[in-house]
């Protein structure tokens, strides 16, 4: 009976067909995965700079006699004349930045005479983003990481616990982007507590005092905010509100009281106290909510949240246009307010169809805005609020019981500062929330968090720079004569330039790009962090902030995050996530109407827009007409789960990989793995080194082709046409759209070094005569094969123990992997040397190096530079350099020798560039940068030479390997092929893994991949298993059966030492494995002589400092337990910090005399000095009658004989 076919053969990339078992009817194709970087930077260049310049100009002098204006639209960005590819290559070679110059046209206007003059001024150099979404800063590729921060706005919270007092509080925080924070709160646990307000970190004061400062009376407060006990308690404690005082007196006293708290220590004047609050909250220059903050505030303070599911306690009457006509009632009293009715009422207020409430009716006038009315007269009209009365319950409505007044701010507000209507609406919301009207905010929800991308971060730096420059310009205008003022001589562009330079060089958000492999490069650009300026601190961030949130679905990957102290603080964008104009993350869905899915256009929604809507998974059953065929559907609604009929579904996911990042989406059978191991798998894929021979996985997820398509390392055709020439260095395509048949040439990269020392080499995947379309891939890069990502290798793996060598996740590999270069990779090391000028003399490039052996100089040419192609090892000279010693560097012994022999000792020392310790390889390139050739170098540097050494690294014991499921280990043994267990047909295994590594880790995905991989290899086909919609267990068993393999996937394996079958069958199959960047060659290290710490006199630690191995507390216990007293004494004295002891030991070893006794370790002396600092005199009592003072530790470094001997060795024989 023929097997039922559960799969389709689909194309992945241009050259690969795979079996696809997924159930999803239609999956949305991926758009540019680097759009978050590119779109943000384009917005900055094309829109934000112009708008910001308009904000800061004109700049007027203090006497208003002269002003500098910006000529609108005159901004000009001068980009490099050469192509981006050439400019980037040159920047990397010369160690400079790839940038464009910003010019603006400024106009000087003398107000008295009307005289006008113009100047074009350079404002700054702006680093340009490359087409791959990165920046070249000082020759290095960097990425600006996007930041996830709390959005400006008003945030309400009920029963939050105070960290200091442990009491429960209700509170509201009003957070601007720039300006003073406001916090209003009261204690929930006490009925007698009053509501207090706090501005910034100043002392809190009564909320009623704050309201009194605007002119609110006790009566108007009750009308607007209700008769709650909390408000009554607050008013009863307010001593300013006296019965015999008029409102003017009350207001004056309240303003002075607030001034004393907020401006503590400053002298009170009537004008200063009157304008304090208006300057703090209503002045846009000092208080800025930003466009996003205003949007958030208007959304929060709308009536919608509070009136939904309540009953109207009044008629909603439309404005009467014709006074002769009777007013129309939109909704009568007693109407139950549904979602749609609430939206209609809110919109009616916004469109002005319902009459607003004027705060003047409550005794509040526009003078609350103080002096700001002079500069912004429009504020006079900003005195309106909206509001309606509601019943909370049906019972209250039927009995005409307690009514609640719900107030919203002016819905037409667009100002970036607070308005009096905002303050009234915020306080009304606060008191209503105490009555459970409205909803509190979740600070960890993406409803309240936004992304700050590269464009906005750069704009912030430009703002700071322009602010400093504005101040500097105004000072210069005041101090110079008007006739001498020109826009050019008073514009100090260093203020802006330094700000941008500092940001790119030292900001936490400007990061060295991870270029280990193409996936790590794309992931770095899609990374988002909660750390950095204005963000969280990793030391104080709580669990709640780090945890996965329901609103992350489709926006932030719940899997990919670091494992260390940054867990949950550094995240990655989900596959389809986008950022809207306000910075909120969106995810796409297909609209569903009456159970029919519209696949024509995806709808992008923010977390807030998902409220009160239902969402189904992409894998539900849908027929060819788009109709949902399941009777009941599991849906996500209000971030919870429910079961509904198809007609109740509003939207459907666009893909099964919607919730995961690119790295997590490339793990097959992700749904069968524990989340912790999936996290490790995602992270380790980014550490896989590109291999010499790339190989795409037999079992993929389908995203590999998408990553290849969007990787900046792969070349894509920019025209439709025909390939007319191909070789290893270039591809030529004849443009079919061009009448003249113009030819487009694409240069291929070869052996280009990355930031991490891995290699980018492009190879063509098209042939002569191939027809290509615009956007088609025409080359593979490192870690790609035939248009798919290929980070590792498909190897034959068996799960079995082998003489204890795979204990604790250790890995046993076959020698075949070494001989056949299966896991061989190439790494490039760049070594640089500079030639400087100094008073003592100049550094010289030479092949004639004093005291250098012929062996170490064997690869140098006549100029002293290593030849390209040379095989070099540790200690070989790459560039010969001699430097002047200078008189101050000549020791007394050398001066004495000079006197004895009347001979001028060579004044030059060998400072050549040598191959680093533990390094070897082939010299593949030498770059010479010098002033003579017109290269820009730092002062005092005449020339700089860079040497590139490539090293071929085969897999060896100590290297780290991993699969895609978090299954990692270190190679413990490389076995000859004949010693590896083999299958019935004689095929030896490539790798042996420990089966005990699977059950407790719960990453079963690796076992499923193993079996399906084996079937793929036998059948000669490739499979695709998308995340959450992959190949099922039954399909794997069918594939194994089709390949004539056991349905269990277990096989008979033979022991090569005996030739007998191993007792039990074991799981054998093909698994995709990586070699990670944690290689033993980078870690192997030993020390014989090296530097010591100045304080403790102990050897330094770490390979980079040629340090020693720490012999710590526990190691000391180990030797103590064995009674190895002499070894222990030697380690803790001579080999560590006994200065005199180690000098004496050196003398004894060189002279062959008896070894000395060890002395007092320096660390003990450091302790003694610390005790002396506390006034405690420490003495050693060896015998009852003797007292020994601790040594002063002032030792002579060497005696004269030793110094003479050392100096004489430095003098070459030819000089005598």
Curated annotation (Swiss-Prot):
Its EC number is 2.7.7.6. Pfam families: RNA_pol_Rpb2_1, RNA_pol_Rpb2_3, RNA_pol_Rpb2_45, RNA_pol_Rpb2_6, RNA_pol_Rpb2_7. Keywords: DNA-directed RNA polymerase, Nucleotidyltransferase, Transcription, Transferase. Residues 1190-1216 have a biased composition (Polar residues). One of its GO terms (biological process) is DNA-templated transcription. The keyword ATP-binding does not apply. Residues 1185-1216 are annotated as: Disordered. It catalyses: RNA(n) + a ribonucleoside 5'-triphosphate = RNA(n+1) + diphosphate. GO terms for molecular function: DNA binding; DNA-directed RNA polymerase activity; ribonucleoside binding. Disulfide bonds: none annotated. SUPFAM superfamilies: beta and beta-prime subunits of DNA dependent RNA-polymerase. InterPro entries: DNA-dir_RNA_pol_bsu_ext_1_sf, DNA-dir_RNA_pol_bsu_external_1, DNA-dir_RNA_pol_su2, DNA-dir_RNAP_su2_dom, DNA-dir_RNAP_su2_hyb_sf, RNA_pol_bsu_bac, RNA_pol_bsu_CS, RNA_pol_bsu_protrusion. One of its GO terms (cellular component) is DNA-directed RNA polymerase complex. DNA-dependent RNA polymerase catalyzes the transcription of DNA into RNA using the four ribonucleoside triphosphates as substrates. Belongs to the RNA polymerase beta chain family. The RNAP catalytic core consists of 2 alpha, 1 beta, 1 beta' and 1 omega subunit. When a sigma factor is associated with the core the holoenzyme is formed, which can initiate transcription. This is DNA-directed RNA polymerase subunit beta.
